Amino acid sequence: LVMDARATGRTPLYLDEIIRRVPANLNELGYMGTIHRDSVDEQQLSGNGWMLRGLCEYYLWKRDEKLLPVISRMADNLFVGGEKYYESYPISPESRKKGVGAASGSLSQIIGHWRLSTDIGCVFIGMEGMLHALQVTKDEKLRPVADKLVNLFLNVDLTGIKAQTHASLTAMRGLIRYADITGKPEYVNEVEKRWEI
């Protein structure tokens, strides 16, 4: 909605009210969904990644300072909070269930501390939202998490795990954003390589 509003110059009727209501509809740690103490839900990272993107875009458009702590808390408690599990994300095609995958994700299987989605690779949708939060908040606590998730993405065989197209393309947008954040154009080169897949 925010991107549409910015592109058309017409604010959707209920957009400001939706944004105003977001904080009251988050859990006690400041993000959407169930609090998983000993696991990470891939679909939850994705949904909150989309939410972060929307909140960041709204902030950049309206400069609504009340959103910065909402963005920071969501990124910190969900993404920094799950940092210890990122290296164990199952990237091996052999570890994945065969014959699953849908644009609308649901729980596919549990491997270790990961609650995996049928929307394969949607963890990287979350990564893109978290990278946008890093760009907007400049919160250096997010930097090591960003490095871990970006490196994870760079090591995934997207065709091997049958990653969803929208998850892969969203992650590539995140890499372009990270190239801007870090000043490292090699991330753009990585996007170009994956674009050819």
Give the ranges of each region predicted by the language model:
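Glycan-recognition and catalytic cores of secretory/periplasmic carbohydrate-active enzymes
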Residues: 1-197
